[in-house]
Amino acid sequence: MLHQNIETFIGCESSYADADIVLYGAPFDSTTSYRPGARFGPAAMRHESYGLETYSPYQDKDLTDIKVFDSGDMELCFGSSESALKDIEARAETILQDGKFPLLLGGEHLVTLGAVRAAARKYPAMHIIHFDAHAGLRQDYLGAELSHACVLRRCHDILGDGRIHQFCIRSGDREEFTFAKTHTEMHKFDFSGLEALAAELCRTQMPVYLTIDLDCLDPSCFPGTGTPEAGGVTFMQLLNAILTVSKTNIIGADVNELAPMLDASGVSTAMACKVLRELLLALNV
């Protein structure tokens, strides 16, 4: 049994037993390659959420109408990526075994790997839909294979070819883009192709894991992230993409790479909260 967090994300006050969705935070950023601070993301989102309404005029839904349990942040070993990933994997596995939907808050993008390990064990035919500025397909980064720069490559090690679908990608080295041509389905710069993919996944009812790196957003509206990349999408484009993916058989998700201290205005944290609210309300669980 997981215990109630003291400061929950707004509207997420269900008991664990009654909840359909379980939030769990992974405050980890030890492999950050540029600007650290993503470990403060989950707590900042919870605190900032109380400046947000529980009601979404975009979807005409309210967080008080759904059952979400916020289990707070995990205690993770900053000095060991594998140890942290094992803890995240164990938490995700518990939530899945209890028949609930796991929604992970990062933290840097490497934390996704722990959740994917657990989800793929329960759903071997799983696909990943990946929103990000960065390909994340390096074999290693400065010799480290467990890095946020390698997270989708490690996910590919688990799932194999043709089951990772990448959108908004606009940064990476030549080898990553070459790898993607034969091993993943990459859509550069925006969400072109997402509706067709979602329709096919709906038809086949394949399990889908959704991972959202918030740096898919343009830094003009979301500067508070470790590796900002010009040329990103808008909030409304991301919201419409989330609503499109919500029609598929989503079995797990994460939102990651908010580094709140890198945006003194607080706009990035407010944006992250709104993305999370809309994702929670879009899930059909």
Identify the residue ranges that each predicted region occupies.
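Conserved alpha-helical scaffold segments that buttress catalytic/binding sites
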Residues: 2-285
